[in-house]
């Protein structure tokens, strides 16, 4: 009987730890950091070494409180490399206090209200001739088209990029990592 109880306890412990491992693996690593679906967009983003420029910009624009709120939000999060693709001096100029409004406009152009997964983008694209269009918090649209096995993103000016990591679930929405800064 003792052996049976010990075996049952060990089996239960393995089952619980196994499900915890599976739960932890549902979100991809981003910028070398684990992303936790129980944390907010800001709480997770600050841990990504690939998003230090974005985090600095969110702070400079005064959007930390908003993106820490209940949302839900879908954030198309440009990497540091995406910001480096902008013309020289652009990021430094945007981060200046006198350009806070312009910076907020650029950043909110990367945010769509609600939780929109890659499956949602796919369904909308399928229903609309291959293109999914979403209106951003900034007020202008972002367009998405299938590119290979992933999704391309395009702003209203024709700048194109790709979603490089999709469906990073957050407590207040979802992040999709993108390789290009979209400009309103």
Give the location of each predicted region.
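Bacterial N-terminal signal peptides that target proteins for export
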Residues: 1-9
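Bacterial N-terminal signal peptides
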Residues: 8-19
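Mature, structured domains of secreted/extracytosolic soluble proteins
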Residues: 21-184
